């Protein structure tokens, strides 16, 4: 018996998306970003489905250790770097690369006693101003890392874009120019491109691309859809109808009597709510997909349920599947209705939602 609600993860969609991104950046290796539990798709599930990716990017050491425990052998990179000196022996033991972006990390590397050097990707702040060494600091930091016995050579180089998801924004060109001028003629790999860089800024692709949301079939650009690039949504978020009710005109439904029917209709109650990670602020009209058509949410989303207007002549039955987002209803469209981004929707599902390989 299938659980509900459930997030059905398509291995064939993940493989398709990897192939599309390889074609987009044919001279680059692909570091699939699987942080935040594989963007809500299941960390180990995604890594196993993408076993032909060249590497995986993660936010936390614990995520990397989970992949190694699951027999994932590919290159792993901690995108925020290590946080404590006690992390360093684990990086060595499990062959995990680390970003270095702050002087405190350099000090820990210099003071550590390790059995072998750690592979480092030095992050340059080319204009996002969140993490990374500034252009003014770069030469001194690079020299310091080069002199450190605990840093493997060559040192690899990276940056991160602030506005690559705005294809007409010139700032990405400025960041590329800053990074390229600083790192010219230095050895090692270079990685600049996230999903938006890989899809929209081909000159940013470098030795490695780091696609995150695009790997899951979702466009990083507001108003765009992954299908426009040949990507396929990897997640179908599915629940079911647990009640179908006759509803009279002028009757309200749900907490606060937030919505009132203008005419006689049939309402469906769906077993999913904000306790599962579906946003409480989803407004009236946010679509779900039932039996081949879009129907609107009405009333407030509650902890365990939401209500939809099936229409006066609806023939939907208790037990029918309901797609909250997925291949028939792009998560980008749902996010636009709710006033958020697809990243937030897929990563905020709670443990009550079963994540299943389809």
Swiss-Prot record:
Entries under Pfam families matching the protein: Ala_racemase_C, Ala_racemase_N
A single GO molecular function term of this UniProt record: alanine racemase activity
Domain of life: Bacteria
GO BP annotations listed: D-alanine biosynthetic process
Keyword line: Isomerase, Pyridoxal phosphate
Positions bound to substrate: 130, 303
Family designation: Belongs to the alanine racemase family.
PANTHER family linked: ALANINE RACEMASE, ALANINE RACEMASE, BIOSYNTHETIC
Protein name: Alanine racemase
